[in-house]
């Protein structure tokens, strides 16, 4: 055997280090996009008044475009990860799981694209609508997808929760923010605003800790508690976005019925 065919340890270590750096870079970029999406929508709310949102569909489009585009794009990336994440032969269960993930993520991406159109065509006529759509809604819909894409592995056979160290605490706090937002979603409560402000702050903390004190990822995401954590996050994703999809379908049905009269 030629000596050139023997794997060199330093090459393997260098490749592993490169993969870790690439993964960290992807996480940091994801955090930045989340912060920009939320901050931009919130900034528009403070710049313009209610009449501007009600009369200007372009302003409504710009306000919802960033957070909902992030969600649509992220689900397409999750689809790509679940579909291309494993080149090894699969058994029937893993193959079925991969097809289920892929179909679900494509569906959710479509829902968010349709939601951009629906929210742009809505008049935002209620007094609370600009605040709700520009600040409350992004901080409600983004956390489940954020946790699924940052804290979990979707590779068949390695599916589970992967965060370690301080990031686990941050994930728990993000989940609590989501639950608070869910409880007070349709109420004019100060608690939903607290949650809407806390979530981007937690993302910022995570970005800084990942940049300067990275915790790394677990090499055993399939341990029992990690699988349970993944299932909990995934259930939140399915419930939240299925409900949104039903609302989108009902709204589209109303529009089509109105147009055909």
Curated annotation (Swiss-Prot):
Residues 1-20 are annotated as: Disordered. Residues 11-20 have a biased composition (Basic and acidic residues). Transmembrane segments: none annotated. InterPro entries: UPF0328. Belongs to the UPF0328 family. This is UPF0328 protein ECU02_0020/ECU04_1700. It comes from Encephalitozoon cuniculi (strain GB-M1).
